[in-house]
């Protein structure tokens, strides 16, 4: 029985004396040299790569895209303002009748509205199902 306990006691003693943590222990004599070499740890590449930009990116290209986006937004606001103005003018001229308004160009469908060859006429099939909607 005594032969089994000795290895367990030695294992417990080694584990208690072992340093806790993920890093390998450094001897006392070399600790100062390593501390001077790697003062900021292992993150030397972080500072080295900060502020680097791609060569393909140019400020002029970014400015042109920004101007195009501003022009698109301005055109949308102008179109919305025209629609609102026509609504207000029609309301004042005709009382409460709503004028025909133009939808904003950004909400137009992506398909060709003239091409209806792919649509099937399903009207007669649904006549008897829901009479209050007919």
From Swiss-Prot:
Gene Ontology MF terms in the entry: neuropeptide hormone activity
Coiled coil stretches, renumbered: none
One GO term describing the cellular component: neuron projection
Lipid metabolism is among the record's keywords: no
Subcellular localization, as worded in the UniProt entry: Cytoplasmic vesicle, Secretory vesicle lumen; Secreted; Cell projection, Neuron projection
Database matches in PROSITE patterns: BOMBESIN (PS00257)
Signal peptide: 1-23
Modified residues (Methionine amide): 50
Basic and acidic residues biased stretches: 123-134
GO biological process, one term: positive regulation of respiratory gaseous exchange
Residues of the propeptide: 54-134
Region (Disordered): 95-134
S-S bridge residues: none
InterPro entries tied to this protein: Bombesin
Keywords: Amidation, Cell projection, Cleavage on pair of basic residues, Cytoplasmic vesicle, Mast cell degranulation, Secreted, Signal
Tissue expression pattern: Detected in adrenal medulla (at protein level).
Protein family (similarity comment): Belongs to the bombesin/neuromedin-B/ranatensin family.
Described function: Stimulates the release of gastrin and other gastrointestinal hormones. Contributes to the perception of prurient stimuli and to the transmission of itch signals in the spinal cord that promote scratching behavior. Contributes primarily to nonhistaminergic itch sensation. In one study, shown to act in the amygdala as part of an inhibitory network which inhibits memory specifically related to learned fear.
Protein's name according to its UniProt entry: Gastrin-releasing peptide
């Amino acid at each position: 029985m005594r032969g089994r306990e000795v290895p367990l006691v030695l294992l417990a003693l080694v584990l208690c004396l072992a340093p806790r943590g993920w890093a390998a222990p450094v001897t006392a004599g070399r600790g100062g040299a390593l501390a001077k070499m790697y003062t900021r740890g292992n993150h030397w590449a972080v500072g080295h790569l900060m502020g680097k930009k791609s060569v393909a990116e140019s400020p002029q290209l970014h400015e042109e895209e920004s101007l195009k986006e501003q022009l698109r937004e301005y055109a949308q606001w102008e179109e919305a303002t025209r629609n609102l103005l026509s609504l207000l003018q029609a309301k004042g001229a005709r009382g409460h009748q709503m004028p025909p308004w133009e939808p904003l160009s950004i909400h137009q469908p992506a398909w060709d509205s003239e091409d209806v060859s792919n649509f099937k006429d399903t009207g007669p099939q649904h006549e008897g199902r829901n009479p209050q909607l007919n």
